[in-house]
Amino acid sequence: MCIFKLFESMFFHQRSTQAEYFDAPERPVAERLAAFRELDRVNQFFRFEHPFVSRLPSWLGEAHCASLEILDVGAGTGLLGRVLSDWASRRGWDWRFTNLDLNPLPLPREDRARIVAGSALELPFADGHFDLVVASQMTHHLTDEDVVRHWREAWRVTRDAIFICDLHRNAGFYALLGPALRLMGIGSQLRRDAMISVRRGFHRREWLELAARAEISDPKVCIYYGTRIVLQARKSGR
């Protein structure tokens, strides 16, 4: 048993319901932008795109990856879409992103993604509108009931696949994250929210149960290097 599975079995049996300051609706736009810039720095340091670039080509097939319409749910600053689009472009692939967020932020001028304001729980798109629906580290902000709604909607609007990545809830990750963020010089508020985020994260069994409730066919759930949890599923006939 690896150390992260041992810590998972010993601690953090239930998700925390403590709210993050990051989610406070009354925060001024300037403060939200500053927080997202700091969060983007953390995400880049921990290579938040790695589960996507390491798994999508072999899973979907390189021929299928040549051209993709992708929805990023809870896109924030759109950083994931920019990183993945650039990565795909270097391989001669065309990945076109639609960034959905409840409160969209202004994107850099060079960002070609479409921006849509909307809820992950009621996506404003027709059935089967996208080749792929992704979400990165936004699912832990939701209650279990809303996770089911979020995934059911993601499954509805994809014509092929969903790929959801979030935080794995375990004490080993929790113990290592705080010192790492301090060494990076991350501010105290984001550090506190990051620790809450881990406690709001998930175990593999929980995601399998939630995927079943969302009526997702043949879901695959795995733990990624002890820190992240990944749900991937494709519709039948693919």
Predicted features by range, described:
Residues 142-153:
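A short, conserved alpha-helix within the catalytic core of class I
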Residues 25-55, 59:
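Class I SAM-dependent methyltransferase Rossmann-like catalytic core
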Residues 134:
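A conserved beta-strand element that flanks and buttresses the S-adenosyl-L-methionine
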Residues 167-213, 220:
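C-terminal alpha-helical "lid/dimerization" subdomain adjacent to the S-adenosyl-L-methionine
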Residues 6-25:
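N-terminal auxiliary segments of SAM/dcSAM-dependent transferases
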Residues 71-73, 77-122:
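Class I SAM-dependent methyltransferase SAM/SAH-binding core
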Residues 220-238:
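Core SAM-dependent methyltransferase catalytic element
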Residues 159-167:
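Conserved beta-strand signature within the Rossmann-like core of class I S-adenosyl-L-methionine
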